[in-house]
Amino acid sequence: MTGGQMGADGQDSTDIMALLDNNMLGSMGDVSMGLDAVDESSMTGSFGGSNAQTSTEESVARAENQFNTAANNVPGAGPLPAGPFAQMNLTSAASTLTEFTKRRNWPAKVVEELRDFLQILDANGRIKYASPSILNVTGYSVEEIQDIFLKDLIHPDDRGVFVAELNESIASGNPLRLFYRFKKKDGKFAIFETVGHAHIAGSKFAPNPNNQSPFCQAVFMMARPYPTKNAGLLDSFLEHKIENERLKRRIAELRREEEAENDEAQKQWMQSQEGRSDVTPSEGTGVSSNFFRPSTDRGLTDADRAALNKSLTRENLEGAAGSRPDSLNDKMARYEGASHTETIEMLTGLRYIEGERSRGITTGNASPTLIKGDAGIAIPLERDPRTGDKKKKLKTSEEYVCTDCGTLDSPEWRKGPSGPKTLCNACGLRWAKKEKKRNSSVNHHHAPGPAIDHSMA
């Protein structure tokens, strides 16, 4: 039964197969009941060309309206489910792509939508074509940049590298990839990442018929600003990871140092306890018995105890505090304080802490090196002509602590019950008045009474 008969009778083949008995179908076990593959062209011819064209247009319309809410706002609309319908969906998408490529001047439309700017150079490096996206990236229009040598728009320090890479790519045919600083229309330089290749034409396209060797017809280059947003995020992520790893190692080192110092302090304390086992309490206390010893005396070393036995001056107190082992917080505080200079060294590559460029020490060369020691400056041997005169000794002023009020600032230090210069001016005067009054009262109490003249009586 042909397709034409099917259309004329208006019956489907399934209706005729339903009239057949199962026994009749069983007797045809060895006979193939499958349908052979039919040529698409013959099927199109049998059903008519207008119907096939209509079905193709409908499939393209369905593929284009797949994500259109207005077209999908009908019963049964929307994306096709998975299964056999998915293959039909892929077929329609492929047909849509084919329809796009069949459009007129579609490569130019693709180039217009590029965010990176495309440039075509001749063999001499002159710009023959630039994509419209160059206006957003560099500020130049296509007409302003056409027929200009690209090297004239590159930073002078990068021109040599660009010319060498361009000539090497033209000579060898290898693709080129380089970074250079491009001068924008506002006069500022921006870093660009460029990839490209030279188009080597055949000998039959040579302008000179006498020269039948292949030649470079054009150089295609694609440039974009560097770094991109994703590259910048990746660089910052790597910098944070490196900084985190460095801080972890530093913390581990400080913890090991603190544990070693604690062990050493414990050993010294044990040795001091063993050495003081044969000392009487009166000999061991001495002057320090006047001070209150807290319960944490075990953490003090011999240097701390010796510092407490000295006179209460600011220098001695600071020395006692400095002789104690630093805690982890103190070490981290010092480390955090020096991180600023370390950041400068990491960003600039200079030995900032040692004085390079920070204190005016520079040689002025392209690759300066830090000069240590004698820098070649003439220094006279005799700076002071009065070298024979005796130099006056600088009087080092010691700062005292008042044992009564605890002040450190006083215009004058006076004698107290603990010795000279142990009281401030006010406390010393007050104590002197008390002593004077006490002495006068004692003297008045022990003074002899008035003599009575018995002769007068």
From Swiss-Prot:
Residues 103-173 form the PAS domain. PROSITE patterns: GATA_ZN_FINGER_1, GATA_ZN_FINGER_2, PAS. Pfam families: GATA (PF00320), PAS_3 (PF08447). InterPro entries: GATA_TF, PAS, PAS-like_dom_sf, PAS_fold_3, Znf_GATA, Znf_NHR/GATA. Residues 268-293 have a biased composition (Polar residues). GO terms for biological process: regulation of DNA-templated transcription. Residues 434-447 have a biased composition (Basic residues). A zinc finger (GATA-type) spans 402-427. Keywords: Activator, DNA-binding, Metal-binding, Nucleus, Transcription, Transcription regulation, Zinc, Zinc-finger. Residues 256-330, 434-457 are annotated as: Disordered. The keyword Iron-sulfur does not apply. GO terms for molecular function: sequence-specific DNA binding; zinc ion binding. GO terms for cellular component: nucleus. It is found in: Nucleus. It comes from the Eukaryota. Its main location: nucleus. Residues 295-317 have a biased composition (Basic and acidic residues). The keyword NADP does not apply. Binds a palindromic promoter element essential for induction of fungal cutinase gene. This is Cutinase gene palindrome-binding protein. It comes from Fusarium vanettenii (Neocosmospora pisi).
